[in-house]
UniProtKB/Swiss-Prot annotation:
Biased composition, class Basic and acidic residues, residue ranges: 68-82
Protein's name according to its UniProt entry: Sec-independent protein translocase protein TatA
Annotated GO MF terms: protein transmembrane transporter activity
Protein family (similarity comment): Belongs to the TatA/E family.
Region described as Disordered: spans on this chain: 44-82
Keyword Transmembrane helix part of the UniProt annotation: yes
Membrane topology, record value: Single-pass membrane protein
Residue spans crossing the bilayer: 1-21
Keywords: Cell membrane, Membrane, Protein transport, Translocation, Transmembrane, Transmembrane helix, Transport
Organism: Mycolicibacterium vanbaalenii (strain DSM 7251 / JCM 13017 / BCRC 16820 / KCTC 9966 / NRRL B-24157 / PYR-1) (Mycobacterium vanbaalenii)
Subunit structure: The Tat system comprises two distinct complexes: a TatABC complex, containing multiple copies of TatA, TatB and TatC subunits, and a separate TatA complex, containing only TatA subunits. Substrates initially bind to the TatABC complex, which probably triggers association of the separate TatA complex to form the active translocon.
UniProt lineage: Bacteria, Bacillati, Actinomycetota, Actinomycetes, Mycobacteriales
Length: 82
């Protein structure tokens, strides 16, 4: 019941034919395939770039010197009426 039955696919295809027309469907499928190929090639290129950009060994942690800061005193008491 949760999956698509064959008659669901028939309805979907009929809607596409009605919306786009029989002449435009091959062009739409061709452009969709071309877009998917471009998308996949970009994903592969990004993965290759990220793998080549990773250093082999992580950098050694650096020591950070800290200084003690004196505590601040209140500048002036509130002079609002109570």
């Amino acid at each position: 019941m949760g999956g698509l039955q064959p008659w669901h696919w028939v309805i979907v295809i009929a809607v596409f034919v009605l919306l786009f027309g029989a002449k435009k469907l091959p062009d739409a499928a061709r452009s969709l395939g071309k877009s998917m190929r471009i998308f996949k090639s970009e994903i592969k290129e990004m993965q290759a770039d990220s793998q080549s950009a990773k250093p082999d060994q992580p950098a050694a942690p650096t020591q950070i010197a800290s200084e003690r800061v004196p505590e601040a005193e209140p500048s002036s008491p509130d002079k609002r009426p109570a």
